[in-house]
Amino acid sequence: MSIKSFLARKWAQYIRKKIDLWAKDPIPTQEKILSSLIQKAKNTVFGKDHHFDQIHSYEDFVKQVPIRDYEALSPYIERVKEAQTDILWPGKPLYFAKTSGTTSGAKYIPLTKESMPYHIQAARDAIMCYIAQTGKADFVNGKMIFLQGSPILEKKNGILLGRLSGISAHYVPKYLQRNRMPSWETNCIEDWETKIDAIVKETIKEDMTVISGIPPWVQMYFERLQEKSHKPIGELFPHFQLFIYGGVNYEPYRQKFEHLIGRKVDSIELYPASEGFFAYQDSQNEKGMLLLLNSGIFYEFVEADTFFSENPKRISLKDVQIGVNYVLIVSTNAGLWGYNMGDTVMFTSLSPYRIVVTGRIKHFISAFGEHVIAKEVEEALAQAVSKAGGEVSEFTVAPQVNPASGELPYHEWFIEFEKLPEDMETFANTLDQGLQAQNSYYKDLIEGKILQRLKITCVPKSTFVEYMKSQGKFGGQNKVQHLSNDRKIADNLKW
């Protein structure tokens, strides 16, 4: 055992104990966070507009601060972008994290001196929890790669602007900098394909032990490595131990990854966003990610089924239930208030509070009232691959409302297979049965002869890569939308 790995184990045990302190005292921790946020922001423009000085309880907060999405909050954000002070949070932000927006245009999310450290701390703590639980720390002696956006930042009215992953690159702890890859120069390459090729060249002969990124882009990295080396990734990097990911559900990609690697590796799921680092997987045995309750973020929840009603009920952490699909609402020490993340989550545990991300409130299929969500299609696909074989590179699902020749409507699955199932009919049946098991409304529509069984359209290799290029969303933190309530994506796939 090296000194480095020995110290990592000791440090991990210390960090885990600190985490357990607030995890075991969740409701008071959240109440203190809300009180602190209100107190610090009461003299801001937003605080005065919403009478923060009159807020003394969660009920007061709900009355004074409505739920807003980015567009509704943008009048305040525009003033922050103009370098006005004390608008949403005291002073001015350190950065704007620019995001293309999952369901809308470009967003400028403020990052403050209070919020930024938590983004870095959470990523570190996720790794520490892994070490504390498993005792595995030898990976700290090898090289680590984080596939991320360019760290080159621009200035807008004196405030630095960039992608969150690029901003985070400026905060890599000194003790990781020697082990971290790729080089700064390579990380600054904007064109994703050029960047991947440069990363492959830099890393192919290194002792890579930790690899991190969004699964579809890490998959591309692995494929390029394999093209060059003609070896499984696990043989090329014999000490590769840990895959860290976020942004999309890993399960649809898992079988393909294990084939590329040639063996199983441990993984840690993260839930980072420009708006905050909300959760991470703290256990290799328990389902879900630990909700971060002591990171300057106050959480609220609205049942997804009621979210678009006239007056949806907001609840705080103490009233959530396991197995209910909630829209995530946050108020943060970066000046977001009653902010609709657009994400939906479900609790898998209440002691401690653990969640899984189930999708986006605007990403669903409900052309016939079925309200199928991302979690359901992803789990059904993972089960179909497990039972009927095949390897999936990427996919998306769209409704076919008006099929030709008078047949019943159906869900159309566009799947890019790396390896076809032996029997496509069996695969399609298994997939449809899996989706029916996930969603009773869909099952009722099938049994009631309103819908026919789903249909699979196999698309050639690189179809989704070409689609993402055509949309200007190739590489980095962008990901393919796995389902939609119209055929905009489906009709733009070219092959």
In which residue ranges do the predicted regions lie?
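Active-site diphosphate/adenylate-binding microenvironment
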Residues: 28, 32-96, 108-114, 118, ...
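Conserved beta-strand scaffold positions in the cores of enzyme catalytic domains, especially
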Residues: 108, 144-146, 267, 456
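Active-site glycine/GP-rich loop and adjacent strand/helix microenvironment
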Residues: 1-53, 61-68, 76-83, 167-495
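Conserved AMP-binding loop of ANL adenylate-forming enzymes
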Residues: 130-174
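Short small-residue beta-strand/loop micro-motif enriched in glycine and branched aliphatics
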Residues: 105-110, 363-367
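Conserved adenylation A10 loop of the ANL superfamily
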Residues: 96-109, 456
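Extended alpha-helical, oligomerization-prone segments that build pores/tubes and scaffolds
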Residues: 123-124, 129-137, 142-144, 179-182, ...
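Long, hydrophobic, well-ordered secondary-structure blocks that form the structural core
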Residues: 110, 115-122, 243-244, 267, ...
